[in-house]
């Protein structure tokens, strides 16, 4: 079902920080930069590789796609600039090449899967995102462009990077968000835990009746960095032991005082390695339980021990603890997320609820955006002419779980729907039907049936709890999904082969 729970990951801040080197507030989790990263020297011109030559300019093959050495070198140059701006010591060139190529391989896998699912991002959506980035950072689009170009990134490259970020965001929503189910029992247990744990409660203050789910009086926020030593799926006991030893050696270096960000950039297998390992900031209850427990007694500025998960061995650094609204750490990625469950200001919460229904047509390899929009336009014409009923059309055409109920979404609170859907819904008067509207789930026709004012204090608390539990799972679930995608793909890493050959020849 398309409503209510969706990842709060946002592309705008990460790209702005990447392009401008701005110290924005930290993002909620592991947002990846848009453009490539580090700079390294080009490998020696040519060396035989058992019949193939590295001189062909191919760094890797991912399924049927080629990643060229030029792409790696361009990414390396950008990464060197970015790392210097962040004050992070540059790894060796060969390490930077390896890190950049790994990022490019994951990016290519994401792009291929998005293409397979029919996820497209048009120029209008990119322009809308640029306007959002500029607005959030108190810039005009023209000023944003000037800053981007002043920092050495062409405007075309910036738009291309932003397009990729949007597509990845939509891919995450399409593949993960709909498959995470939070039960009422889990919400009940979460709220009980909140009540028992004073550290997770907002500051005491009576708030007046308000017209929206207001920002909290200060949820406890936690900013984390990570160094990940990845363990491949199906690794042998000897391989696992060797990788644990690698994690132990890294931890020993950190205990001796080595800079966490520099070690992360050189040694981490995590997607945020080239950002110095910075994963972001969230309400403390938005992090996976495994991480929260591991750093429960770790003061700001210190590192945890080694934590083992299904992905490998993690070492975490507590970058900051504090209330929402406190100054964020210097290394940044994106706008501060909205407070999570249990964080609503105390006192009654009055909202305008909307009773709505919709028809959803999903895009795919066989259903393009244009085809989906045209089909809904035809349905809308029938509805406007009175030759068909909305509920009948929903049962016949809608691909949402609400189709058997005639597309009825019930009463919807502000903030429950994805932004494009909510904006279209809010623009309608009762009885009106929207034009086709696009969301990460596909294309919709929306009809508003009625509106009402309601005290939703308890509902809002449960909704926020559900969202917090969802956020705990969404990030790790996407990482697991990407690992499975990688395991199923054909990947010929020629840089890695070249490195092994050179080591054997020494």
From Swiss-Prot:
This is Chaperone SurA. SUPFAM superfamilies: FKBP-like (SSF54534), Triger factor/SurA peptide-binding domain-like (SSF109998). Chaperone involved in the correct folding and assembly of outer membrane proteins. Recognizes specific patterns of aromatic residues and the orientation of their side chains, which are found more frequently in integral outer membrane proteins. May act in both early periplasmic and late outer membrane-associated steps of protein maturation. Residues 1-29 form the signal peptide. Residues 219-320, 351-450 form the PpiC domain. One of its GO terms (molecular function) is unfolded protein binding. It comes from Bordetella avium (strain 197N). It is an enzyme of class 5 (isomerase). The keyword Transport does not apply.
């Amino acid at each position: 079902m398309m409503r209510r729970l969706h990842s709060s990951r946002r592309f705008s801040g990460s790209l702005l920080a990447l392009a401008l080197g701005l110290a924005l507030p930290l993002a909620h989790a592991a947002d990846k930069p848009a453009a490539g990263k580090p700079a390294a020297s080009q490998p020696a011109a040519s060396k035989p590789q058992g019949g193939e030559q590295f001189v062909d300019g191919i760094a890797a093959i991912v399924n049927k796609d080629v990643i060229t050495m030029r792409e790696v070198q361009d990414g390396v140059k950008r990464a060197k600039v970015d790392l210097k701006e962040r004050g992070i010591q540059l790894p060796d060139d060969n390490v930077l090449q390896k890190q950049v190529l790994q990022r490019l391989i994951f990016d290519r896998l994401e792009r291929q899967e998005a293409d397979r699912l029919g996820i497209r991002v048009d120029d209008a959506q990119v322009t809308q995102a640029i306007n959002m980035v500029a607005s959030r950072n108190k810039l005009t689009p023209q000023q944003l462009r000037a800053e981007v170009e002043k920092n050495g990134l062409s405007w075309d490259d910036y738009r291309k990077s932003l397009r990729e970020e949007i597509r990845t965001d939509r891919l995450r929503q399409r593949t993960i968000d709909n498959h995470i189910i939070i039960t009422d029992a889990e919400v009940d247990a979460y709220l009980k835990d909140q009540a028992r744990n004073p550290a997770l409660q907002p500051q005491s203050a009576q708030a007046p009746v308000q017209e929206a789910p207001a920002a909290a009086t200060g949820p406890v926020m936690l900013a984390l960095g990570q160094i990940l030593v990845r363990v491949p799926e199906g690794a042998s006991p000897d391989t696992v032991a060797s990788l644990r030893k690698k994690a132990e050696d890294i931890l020993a270096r950190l205990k001796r005082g080595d800079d966490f960000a520099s070690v992360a950039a050189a040694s981490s297998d995590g997607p945020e390695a080239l950002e110095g390992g910075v994963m972001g900031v969230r309400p403390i209850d938005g992090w996976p339980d495994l991480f929260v427990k591991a750093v429960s007694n770790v003061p700001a500025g210190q590192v945890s021990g080694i934590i083992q998960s299904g992905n490998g061995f993690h070492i975490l650094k507590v970058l900051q603890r504090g209330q929402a609204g406190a100054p964020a750490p210097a290394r940044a990625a994106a706008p501060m997320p909205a407070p999570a469950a249990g964080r609503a200001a105390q006192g009654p919460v009055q909202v305008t609820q909307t009773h709505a229904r919709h028809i959803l047509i999903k895009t795919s390899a066989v259903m393009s955006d244009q085809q989906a929009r045209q089909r809904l336009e035809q349905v809308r014409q029938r509805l406007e002419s009175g030759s068909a009923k909305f509920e009948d059309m929903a049962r016949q055409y809608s691909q949402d779980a609400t189709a058997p109920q005639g597309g009825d979404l019930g009463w919807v609170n502000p903030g429950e729907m994805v932004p494009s859907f909510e904006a279209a819904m809010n623009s309608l008067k009762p009885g009106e039907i929207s034009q086709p509207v696009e969301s990460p789930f596909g294309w919709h026709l929306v009809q508003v049936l009625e509106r009402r004012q309601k005290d939703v204090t308890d509902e809002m608390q449960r909704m926020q709890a559900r969202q917090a539990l969802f956020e705990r799972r969404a990030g790790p679930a996407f990482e697991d999904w990407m690992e499975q995608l990688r395991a199923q793909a054909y990947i010929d890493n020629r840089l890695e082969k070249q490195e092994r050959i050179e080591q054997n020849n020494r």
